[in-house]
């Protein structure tokens, strides 16, 4: 099932039926470059070959491999990965200074990027409020780590990588 007209993205499977909720291409009401869940402006691409279907999220103006955003949240000493097309068959792993650290922990929360954006707006902008999302992952890292990479493997075996420098 594919649905839309929300301003956030969500994917889940229930009773053997896969449901895609696609965010509006305008993101958070044309109010910036993200949706309420922190996902970039973009759209879903479905590829059908014979009796198989696969899909990915295409961020507007970005390469096809742009499937996540990494943020270091100093207040909790953790790296947060927002993997906007995530579903339960994906794997999200962290590498700190070249060392494999294992799978990140999924949690429900607000995108750090969208929360910061909302907090920077003038009072009275309630329609830009971020929404809780379940496609966030976090892992605490040692305070001496300089570079972090996150490797995401989707349900089709495609691998995506993003890296950030810490301080």
Residue spans of the language-model regions?
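Conserved beta-sheet core of the metallophosphoesterase superfamily
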Residues: 1-72, 91, 100-102, 118-120
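Long, low-complexity serine/threonine/glycine- and acidic-rich segments characteristic of extracellular
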Residues: 66-167
């Amino acid at each position: 099932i594919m649905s839309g007209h929300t301003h956030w993205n969500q994917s889940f499977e229930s009773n053997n039926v896969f449901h895609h909720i696609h965010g509006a291409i305008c993101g958070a009401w044309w109010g910036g470059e993200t949706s309420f869940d922190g996902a970039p402006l973009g759209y879903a691409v479905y590829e059908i070959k014979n009796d198989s279907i696969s899909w990915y999220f295409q961020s507007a103006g970005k390469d096809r491999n742009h499937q996540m955003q990494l943020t270091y949240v100093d207040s909790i000493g953790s790296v947060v990965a927002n993997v906007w097309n995530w579903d339960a068959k994906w794997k999200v792993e962290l590498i700190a200074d070249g060392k494999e650290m294992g799978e990140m922990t999924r949690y429900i929360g607000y995108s750090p990027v969208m929360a910061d954006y909302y907090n920077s707006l003038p009072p009275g902008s309630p329609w830009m409020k971020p929404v809780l999302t379940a496609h966030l992952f976090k892992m605490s890292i040692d305070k001496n780590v300089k570079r972090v990479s996150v490797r995401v493997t989707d349900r089709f075996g495609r691998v995506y990588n993003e890296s950030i420098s810490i301080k």
